[in-house]
Every structure is written in structure tokens, then in C-alpha cells.
């Protein structure tokens, strides 16, 4: 219900597929050359999830292979889906990072409808880890509700129990708290009029983001509590993993 696509593409979100890969790789090369000797990372899931259509496009496989032997180019994407078997035998050379969006059972069941459940995503992540990819988990949006603290603690413990221990050093976390724009709220309520997703602005504070527009975010006290709940738990159960950020 909270998905970016519902507000970016209106009431009928769609997946945009680009078929001009050769041209895109040429553009990417121009950016890489400009930034050398720095390494340039390209994000493959900024506006849509590429995994559900990979069976038709093979875009991810071709992109992973393209960057596998590039000295200065890297690739990454994030998904909520689990059909990753076609990516397991590709020569990735550790140059592609694959991340999975995870959340508590309640969030996935109530507000993440139409996607594979938590355990299916974790099973897919295990396959990716065993295939040698750098991998990660994007926990988000982190939503506060009754007993949310315990649910997120249990989520971290479940992750720790499922990931192959030898791969934890290649694991990263991105922690993203729930936020919404006025446009997002309007669109969500139109598409999901019966939603119980908490969109009450009186419980939020207004904050301008990096792209120049504002969002309703959790107040500092709530943000601090989220940090206190998740960060120590990750450090305790997955000490070799890296926490990239909490926003």
C-alpha cells in the first residue's frame, strides 16, 4: 500500500522495461570514464522491481555479465521477489550486489500484498548468498504499530537463523523508516480506500528531502526508538554484517 509506484505512476502502476541495453551500457561507460579511478555503482531498481520480468527480458543477467569484468563499474538492485534461479550460475565476479526488501510478517501480510512472503524472500536470499554474490537486506518501510518492537527483533533473529554463516561478511543492511508525501497519501487512499496503514500527519513531522520536496516522517523520538531497537539487534546477531544507513 505504501509503494512508490502507486504514487509515481498513478492508480495503475506498471513496470517499465528498457530494451536498448547496448545504448544504456554505452551511456554508463561515459559516466564511469568521467569518474575514474573511482568506482561507479549503478542502481537497477530505482523505479521498479526488475526481477518479476527477468524471465522475459534477461536484462539482469545481461547487466550482471556486462559488469562482471569491468574494473570500475558495479551494479546493484533490490527486489521483493524470489524467482532468482536464472541468476545463480552467472559469472558475477562479485561486482553485482543483490538486495532483498524484508519486513515483519504483519507488514508483509497487511500492506505488501501480491508479493512473495517473508520466508520465500529469505530462501531466495540464501540462494544468492551461496552463489557468492555480495547481498543485502533493505528493511523497510519500518512501521510502528502495536508490538512493532518485538516483531522487528524477531525479524532480525529470523534473518540471522536463515543466512549462511560464512556469507555474513558479505551482507549489508539498509534501514528505511516509513514516510509519505501528501500526494502519496491521496493516491494510497484512492487505490486502497480500506487500508489501515497509518497516514496520520499529527503523528509525524515535516521534512524536506534530498530531491527538494517534503515528506511526513517519524518525529525524532520515534526515530531514536527505532534505532535503539534494530541497530543493537543486528550488531548482536550478525556482527560481521554492515549497516549502511538508517533514514
Label every model-predicted segment:
Residues 1-99:
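Conserved Radical SAM active-site core
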Residues 57, 98-101, 148-164, 191-200:
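Short, electropositive alpha-helical surface patch
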Residues 36-40, 71-75, 93-96, 131-135, ...:
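Short, well-ordered coil/turn segments that N-cap beta-strands
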Residues 160-247:
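Auxiliary Fe-S-binding modules of radical SAM enzymes
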Residues 121-182, 237:
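Conserved C-terminal portion of the radical SAM core fold
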Residues 47-52, 82-85, 96-115, 141-146, ...:
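Conserved radical SAM core fold
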Residues 55-58, 85-92, 148-156, 185-188:
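Distinct, well-ordered alpha-helical segments
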Residues 27-34, 86-91, 118-131, 230:
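Structured alpha-helical segments in the cores of large, soluble enzyme domains
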Amino acid at each position: 500500500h505504501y509503494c512508490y509506484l502507486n504514487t509515481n505512476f498513478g492508480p495503475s502502476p506498471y513496470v517499465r522495461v528498457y530494451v536498448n541495453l547496448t545504448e544504456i551500457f554505452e551511456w554508463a561507460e561515459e559516466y564511469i570514464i568521467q569518474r575514474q579511478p573511482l568506482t561507479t555503482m549503478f542502481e537497477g531498481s530505482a523505479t521498479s522491481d526488475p526481477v518479476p520480468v527477468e524471465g522475459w527480458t534477461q536484462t539482469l543477467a545481461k547487466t550482471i555479465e556486462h559488469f562482471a569484468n569491468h574494473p570500475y563499474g558495479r551494479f546493484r538492485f533490490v527486489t521483493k521477489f524470489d524467482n532468482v534461479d536464472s541468476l545463480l550460475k552467472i559469472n558475477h565476479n562479485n561486482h553485482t550486489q543483490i538486495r532483498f526488501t524484508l519486513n515483519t510478517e504483519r507488514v508483509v501480510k497487511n500492506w505488501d500484498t501480491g508479493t512473495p512472503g517473508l520466508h520465500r524472500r529469505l530462501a531466495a536470499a540464501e540462494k544468492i548468498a551461496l552463489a557468492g554474490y555480495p547481498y543485502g537486506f533493505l528493511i523497510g518501510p519500518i512501521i510502528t504499530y502495536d508490538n512493532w518492537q518485538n516483531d522487528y527483533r524477531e525479524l532480525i533473529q529470523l534473518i540471522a537463523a536463515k543466512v549462511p554463516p560464512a556469507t555474513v561478511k558479505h551482507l549489508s543492511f539498509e534501514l528505511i523508516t516509513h514516510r509519505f508525501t501528501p500526494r502519496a497519501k491521496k493516491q494510497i487512499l484512492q487505490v486502497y480506500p480500506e487500508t489501515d496503514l497509518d497516514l496520520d500527519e499529527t503523528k509525524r513531522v515535516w521534512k524536506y528531502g534530498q530531491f527538494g520536496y517534503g515528506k511526513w516522517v517519524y518525529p525524532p523520538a520515534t526515530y531514536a526508538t527505532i534505532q535503539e531497537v534494530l541497530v543493537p539487534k543486528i550488531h548482536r546477531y550478525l556482527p560481521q554484517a554492515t549497516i549502511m544507513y538508517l533514514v
